[in-house]
């Protein structure tokens, strides 16, 4: 699985891909200069169960760590992932 990221000053998204095939997207918006809100995560029907959703949220966590950002997980899927990985991801969680 590979990742593309598109980012503007106000919002952005990650795309999970398998070759040229898009598997899913995770959308975020900026909440200041050092934190972003995960708004929505979606996985294409044929990619469900492949780990694409987890890959997208993990990619957001990696991006936050590399840039000293915090994450506000408003998306239900991302929020559930943060609860599941609360000890591992608490360093990037905005509380």
Regions inferred by a protein language model and the residue ranges of each:
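C-terminal structural segments of small proteins and small subunits
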Residues: 63-95
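Conserved beta-hairpin
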Residues: 12-23
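Short beta-strand micro-motifs enriched in acidic
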Residues: 6, 29-31
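Conserved acetyl-CoA pyrophosphate-binding loop and the N-cap/start of the following alpha-helix
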Residues: 47, 51-56
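Conserved beta-strand in the GNAT
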Residues: 21-29, 37
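Aromatic/hydrophobic pocket-lining residues that form π-stacking "cages" and hydrophobic walls in ligand
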Residues: 60
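Conserved acetyl-CoA binding element of GNAT-fold acetyltransferases
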Residues: 34-45
């Amino acid at each position: 699985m590979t990742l593309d990221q598109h980012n503007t000053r106000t919002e952005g998204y990650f795309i999970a891909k398998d070759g040229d095939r898009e598997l899913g997207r995770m959308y975020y918006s900026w909440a200041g200069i050092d934190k972003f809100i995960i708004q929505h995560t979606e996985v294409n029907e044929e990619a469900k169960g492949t780990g694409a959703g987890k890959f997208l949220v993990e990619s957001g966590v990696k991006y936050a760590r590399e840039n000293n950002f915090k994450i506000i997980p408003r998306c239900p899927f991302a929020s559930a992932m943060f609860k599941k990985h609360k000890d591992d991801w608490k360093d990037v969680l905005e509380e």
